[in-house]
Amino acid sequence: MANRSIRDGDNPELLEERRMATFDTDKMAAVIYGSEEFARRRREITDAVSKIPELADIKPYPFLTREEKVTEGTRKISILTKYLNQLIDRDNEEESLHLHREVIGYEGHPFALHDALFIPTLQSQASDEQQEKWLERARRREIIGCYAQTELGHGSNLRNLETTAVYDIASQEFVLHTPTTTALKWWPGALGKSCNYALVVAELIIKRNNYGPHFFMVQLRDEKTHIPLKGVTVGDIGPKMNFNAADNGYLGLNNLRVPRTNLLMRHCKVEADGTYVKPPHAKIGYSGMVKIRSQMAMEQGLFLAHALTIAARYSAVRRQGHLDDKQVEVKVLDYQTQQHRLFPSLARAYAFIFTGFETIHLYSQLLKDVDMGNTSGMADLHALTSGLKSVVAHETGEGIEQARMACGGHGYSMASYISVVYGIAIGGCTYEGENMVMLLQLARYLVKSVELIKAGKAKKLGPVASYLADKSDETDLTSLNGYVKMFENMARRQAWKATEKFLKLMESGESREVAWNKSAVELTRASRLHTRLFIIEAFMRRVSRIEDIPVKEVLTDLLHLHVNYELLDVATYALEFMSFTQLDYVRDQLYLYLEKIRPNAVSLVDSFQISDMQLRSVLGRRDGHVYENLFKWAKSSPLNNADVLPSVEKYLKPMMEKAKL
Amino acid sequence: MANRSIRDGDNPELLEERRMATFDTDKMAAVIYGSEEFARRRREITDAVSKIPELADIKPYPFLTREEKVTEGTRKISILTKYLNQLIDRDNEEESLHLHREVIGYEGHPFALHDALFIPTLQSQASDEQQEKWLERARRREIIGCYAQTELGHGSNLRNLETTAVYDIASQEFVLHTPTTTALKWWPGALGKSCNYALVVAELIIKRNNYGPHFFMVQLRDEKTHIPLKGVTVGDIGPKMNFNAADNGYLGLNNLRVPRTNLLMRHCKVEADGTYVKPPHAKIGYSGMVKIRSQMAMEQGLFLAHALTIAARYSAVRRQGHLDDKQVEVKVLDYQTQQHRLFPSLARAYAFIFTGFETIHLYSQLLKDVDMGNTSGMADLHALTSGLKSVVAHETGEGIEQARMACGGHGYSMASYISVVYGIAIGGCTYEGENMVMLLQLARYLVKSVELIKAGKAKKLGPVASYLADKSDETDLTSLNGYVKMFENMARRQAWKATEKFLKLMESGESREVAWNKSAVELTRASRLHTRLFIIEAFMRRVSRIEDIPVKEVLTDLLHLHVNYELLDVATYALEFMSFTQLDYVRDQLYLYLEKIRPNAVSLVDSFQISDMQLRSVLGRRDGHVYENLFKWAKSSPLNNADVLPSVEKYLKPMMEKAKL
């Protein structure tokens, strides 16, 4: 059997879909998740979790108040702590991520930053003695930590952080202080209520000299009572668009004193007498950010996959209207408009995941290079991941919302759960670097590259930018390589054009900053085209390496859909290099591949193997029994606990009675 | 003073902005709201409401649980009932809408459908005797009603509703029945918990003949106890993406009997012996839908205005990074990327509101014509509003999300409130006709129009479609009329092209339905272009009628921004009619007008005169005191009621203690 999701008793609508699969969904999962081994481990973890009743949701998440969500996240994390060694290899980040997604979902928990930033920062920034003191305790979860950097008044611009750590030579202490309301640390996950320690980023000041932002270990709460220490003002920043099981917090410090040895001193040092010893390499703190961004394409791809799983399955269950058959209504998945809403996003989900694998691989490669003293790849990867993060998070958000709307009215119900996935995914446009800022960081790299070429130094270009030095050729669209050439033409033209605009403005007398700002939108356009080119190439590279023929065939269809959709989407740029006849051809190809994908659509989403537990969606259930479960779900929702609501007794009944008089 | 929003003690950042206004914001408000009279009434209502303490929010809405939101909506509506006559002219729909938006906001209340559909349907569908029986009681709010049409298994396809009303001649009763789970009425606002009556849409069946959907008055709950009657299963459908103060409901009817006279019989009749008397005009029930859609452009424009008010004000308060001045950080509103995120949407907000006025006017004109027996304009307006509803709701959603992201991290906090506005507005892509279905309804009209032209009957075209018969001319972009011509060229070309594709597929042997489906995406493209053309023209018509020079000047700038942005957005189509040099000109114009709008940006959003109460946003406060109020808001959020959460006591403390052993 090719689709492995078939079970007895399934809705026949989905059975029919799954029987059309032309490939083995387990083999596709191995391609999606990078190895047969990890795809199998995912299934095993899902299976093991399903057998531990205390790890199940106490209620559907949408029925919980915010306080209940925080409690539920905390309950789950404390229970998971018991089972961790039994369920996963704790050193395997991917297994851990999958486990947490299954059990806790997307809405957050008190250990989010503890594992993702607190411990890694201790590992990379704390000296050996400091690690001895704190790292094991943190690993054993004796203490809970977070990472406190952004402030109420400042996000991405680290140079203007207001929190200070002034060194007091007499007592050999740092005095940490947030002098204004805008200096309050704001947003760090789990800072508000859960953590008792924080790594606080503050401007290091010695004898009135500012040495810039550094990390300080700060105890926030008493380890026994959990009550905030004197000088510490800490609390939750209030409800958010999503992540409401997490207690993102604020933190004010009122001349709080910590010992000199609480400055993380792996790379820099402050001696007892106040002598500052510089770190050997200025960019050493940089790579954590690049790491997280390099994982984002994969993560966002999975968010998109989540939403599409729900929408594609539901679209095969929902019938509405008629085509040829006047007796039986048609599955809404048979409408071209529905396919056009879902399938290009499906191609993107695959593309993003494959691109994510590549950047994660590039990142590990970079770490090895840096260890060997070679930091030349840093700028390339930083630029690449900045662009990817922006483009992928933006297109993921669009795709998720279209998936939700493709579910009609029921998509709007929390029973679809798609709006939660949207809320989480769209955060990616803002966190880890605001999208416009990120696109402009990539643009800086592109402009530098063009300037290198103009200076005759094209050989110094990073591998991702080398096409910028090529000549734009006429190309045909008879092969995938033709599409790549077309995207190269477009990305190259726009990078040069935006650079020229910027340079011309400077020549005309504008300052560098003003010229940059006046070219900014054109520069972001260049960054987007460059990034989309990279995604297409990564998709192609991955497909070319697949050995299983049926899997390769359907992914080749998806790739064709992708290149045609993408090209049409930016055809304004393409028309400098192709004719309207070619454009019509691209359109026809697009519609052709929508039809080609149709029979495999449900199997392509099944291949993501996102369990019902993780989907948390009535519409997206594997078994397709949507309607009876929507009714069940609704009946159990909290508002239905009473037939007559207290508010009806209190307000509506008296109002109606009074009107009768 | 030109900007009327200036008060003592405001944040100087906003004061500086407002002092740059080149026009009078009260005069602009009169243009936005159609008359000086209504703009003034809005301010008076806002002012009056602010003086009635019991109409204030008991807490910021984001701090309320769903149950508390329902209670709060109910409390407010019952208090408002007392004050209605004092605060507004009850016959004035606009005043009523404004009042409800101020006091209750966007998240719903138990009378949403009572006023908007229950009473109007009684007015248009109930006979005089029936009106006497129910209408006055409904108006006095002795009873609360809703309108129950969509079912769990069927939304827009009315022909396949499953609920039946079988006439029993012996007892002269209708037997109402929902035979399956999918037949449950699903979604009607206030049906779940608040209403005691419903107008139920059911298939009328007499002697096994199905006469199609009809309206039946059905009592759901006992008027005294509010307990559901026998045969009635009713409840809340659970939490939604938004509208969570509303109890959208489900309804099952188990062979419930109602008297023959509960069929609404203004236009059709069922005699005691089961004789069915047809309504005189088949489309008579149609116009309610057209009315609501004709108001949607205005409504969505105001949602967009709401989000932009928040984002523009906050962008003038938030400082981040540097341009020329290395000492003082720059307002983020000075970044071109930020302007590009906000100002084209600002132009659209104005455009949508102006377009809304036109369609509302066309609707009243239509009603007069229909009264005179002339229904010829019906199809035109139906097509127009179908397209408008789709394009405007889609672009509004995009614009609101961009506004939220323009606020960076704080945009993601519920303190911005933008995500609530998004949740409400984006519902407009689905309710009142799913967007794709709507675009295809307009497409049907466009195809018919092209077929008329091909048949030599161009004179029969509706006024909105007459341009389809013109020849495509070369045009220049030196005047606004040039842009209109360009949009006509594009919309015409695409309408013809999509029609040809459809006809060709039929010629090649496909059935009408299949040919239609295979052309569907191209047809929706035609509908979008046609609609965007109409919006541009409506914007131009409105600006041309303005007398106040300063107001006209700034709106002319906004109009120029609009046409350039819109043209660039669909340049793929435009390039068939213009050169790349012209395209570069359009880009330059776009950036030029972003700069031109900049000094008036805050004053342009101030002109919407959306009160702080209605904004419900800490970021968007009129006085600009954002940061201290964010802190205040956060401190008062429910999670901060205790320093140490119960979940910390119960789960985290034991976990940490155990780890120490």
UniProtKB/Swiss-Prot annotation, chains A, B:
Inducing factors: Induced by high temperatures (25 degrees Celsius). Down-regulated in dauer conditions.
Co-factor(s): FAD
Cystine crosslinks: none
Positions annotated to bind FAD: Y147, A148, Q149, T150, G155, S156, G189, R318, Q338, Q339, H340, R341, G409, E434
Primary subcellular site in the record, as a coarse category: other
Compartmental location: Peroxisome
Superkingdom, taxonomy of origin: Eukaryota
Positions of short motif Microbody targeting signal: 659-661
Activity modulation: Activated by ATP. ATP binding leads to a conformational change that promotes FAD cofactor binding and enzyme activity. ATP binding likely occurs during acox-1.2 folding and/or dimer formation. The preference for processing substrates with shorter fatty acid chains is likely due to the closed conformation of the active site.
Pathway field: Lipid metabolism; peroxisomal fatty acid beta-oxidation
Transmembrane segments: none
Record-linked Gene3D superfamilies: Acyl-CoA dehydrogenase/oxidase, N-terminal domain, Butyryl-CoA Dehydrogenase, subunit A, domain 2, Butyryl-CoA Dehydrogenase, subunit A, domain 3
Gene Ontology BP terms: ascaroside biosynthetic process; fatty acid beta-oxidation using acyl-CoA oxidase
Keyword list, A-Z: ATP-binding, FAD, Fatty acid metabolism, Flavoprotein, Lipid metabolism, Nucleotide-binding, Oxidoreductase, Peroxisome
EC number: 1.3.3.-
Catalytic reaction list: asc-omegaC5-CoA + O2 = asc-omegaDeltaC5-CoA + H2O2
Residues given in the record as ATP binding sites: H340, S390, H394, Q402, R525, A526, S527, R528, Y573
Stated family: Belongs to the acyl-CoA oxidase family.
PANTHER family: ELECTRON TRANSPORT OXIDOREDUCTASE, PEROXISOMAL ACYL-COENZYME A OXIDASE 1
Protein name: Acyl-coenzyme A oxidase acox-1.2
Organism whose genome encodes this protein: Caenorhabditis elegans
Organism lineage: Eukaryota, Metazoa, Ecdysozoa, Nematoda, Chromadorea
Name of the gene encoding the protein in the UniProt record: acox-1.2
